[in-house]
């Protein structure tokens, strides 16, 4: 499906953990913009924000912000509904907590899974062009080319 979002004020949350979404309901109200969230994280959203609404952000969905086409890619692991947002023409991936510089995102939280995040990286992320810049949810940016060669090392170390 294609969504045209006329304002960058829409809130897109790539995973449902408090370090990223605590202010979402209030921000949504203040700027009159919807919150977008993968439905698999809906139970976590409702646990923290009872009765608060969100719009579904589904795997493969595309939308445009400020003239940039973006594609949603489901990458469970950090949370059940984690997604990354890929701006193919810009050569950028907004990875949230799915991929950091130096390894996969954290999986030590409730509802996280190391095996699942590794599968997500193999299935959706590490096959992107090597020059793709990865804008992470924490820390410095990196590239797919800098990270992909280390997959087996991450699997061996278990994080």
Q: How should these model regions be labeled?
A:
Residues 51, 74, 80-159:
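Metallo-beta-lactamase
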Residues 10, 14-69, 149-153, 157:
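Active-site HxH/HxHxD metal-binding segment of metal-dependent hydrolases
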Residues 7, 63-68, 87-89, 128:
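Glycine-rich phosphate-binding loop signature in dinucleotide/nucleotide-binding domains
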Residues 62, 76-77:
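Short polar/acidic secondary-structure junctions
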Residues 1-9, 13:
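Single conserved hydrophobic/aromatic residue that forms the stacking wall/gate
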């Amino acid at each position: 499906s294609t969504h045209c979002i006329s304002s960058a004020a829409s809130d897109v949350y790539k995973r449902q953990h408090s370090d990223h979404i605590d202010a979402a309901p209030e921000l949504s109200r203040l700027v009159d913009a919807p919150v977008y969230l993968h439905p698999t994280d809906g139970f976590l959203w409702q646990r923290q924000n009872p009765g608060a609404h969100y719009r579904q952000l589904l795997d493969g969905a595309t939308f445009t912000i400020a003239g940039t086409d973006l594609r949603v890619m489901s990458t469970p692991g950090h949370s059940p509904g984690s997604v990354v947002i890929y701006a193919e023409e810009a050569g950028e991936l907004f990875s949230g907590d799915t991929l950091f510089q130096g390894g996969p995102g954290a999986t030590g939280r409730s509802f996280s899974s190391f095996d699942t995040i590794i599968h997500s990286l193999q299935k959706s992320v590490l096959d992107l062009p090597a020059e793709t810049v990865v804008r992470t949810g924490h820390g410095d940016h990196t590239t797919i080319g800098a990270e992909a060669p280390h997959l087996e090392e991450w699997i061996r170390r278990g994080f």
